[in-house]
């Protein structure tokens, strides 16, 4: 009887631990990831925009390292680029291709990771039109060719040519 009561008690504890294990992930899964919060902010920017096409996340700066409450505002910095999808479409921006030579905007501000709180404060400024073309390959710049200095090669020194000395034959004037 005692073992039967112990096994019932153990079964109840197992059931409680199982239920607790199911509830805790649900509570922690409610917080958005940094990227998800930024994607929601981009969606809100697209809804509030008066421009013809949707914008899509191009680059996201790394998340701050501090672990804080999901309800607090986190600083964000990211870039968006114009897509080919019109703003009136129901298609998500992530499924749209980037527009060739589309506008690129740098955005900074704050977002919250709490999914029930869609508050964000984002300001975007146009950077430039980005053209995706391969870089021009140019040959490397080389300095002009200057060979090492070498003095001119001269023939070995030879004295001027003089015929060999031949004593004169005959009487010499001034000698006796």
Swiss-Prot record:
The modification Pyrrolidone carboxylic acid is found at residue 30. It comes from the Eukaryota. Residues 141-176 have a biased composition (Pro residues). InterPro entries: Cathelicidin-like (IPR001894), Cathelicidin_CS (IPR018216), Cystatin_sf (IPR046350). Binds to the lipid A moiety of bacterial lipopolysaccharides (LPS), a glycolipid present in the outer membrane of all Gram-negative bacteria. Shows a potent antimicrobial activity against the Gram-negative bacteria E.coli, S.typhimurium and P.aeruginosa. Less active against the Gram-positive bacteria S.aureus, L.monocytogenes and B.subtilis. Belongs to the cathelicidin family. This is Cathelicidin-2.
């Amino acid at each position: 009887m005692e073992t039967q009561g112990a096994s019932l008690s153990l079964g109840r504890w197992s059931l409680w631990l199982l239920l607790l294990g199911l509830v805790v992930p649900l509570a922690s899964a409610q917080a958005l990831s940094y990227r998800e919060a930024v994607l929601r902010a981009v969606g809100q920017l697209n809804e509030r925009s008066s421009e013809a096409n949707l914008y899509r996340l191009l680059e996201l700066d790394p998340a701050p390292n501090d672990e804080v409450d999901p309800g607090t505002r986190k600083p964000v910095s990211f870039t968006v680029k114009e897509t080919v999808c019109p703003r009136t479409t129901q298609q998500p921006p992530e499924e749209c291709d980037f527009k060739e030579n589309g506008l690129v905007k740098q955005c900074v501000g704050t977002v919250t990771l709490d999914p029930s709180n869609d508050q964000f404060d984002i300001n975007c400024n146009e950077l430039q039109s980005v053209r995706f073309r391969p870089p021009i390959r140019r040959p490397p710049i080389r300095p002009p060719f200057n060979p090492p200095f070498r003095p001119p090669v001269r023939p070995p020194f030879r004295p001027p040519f003089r015929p060999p000395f031949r004593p004169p034959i005959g009487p010499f004037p001034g000698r006796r």
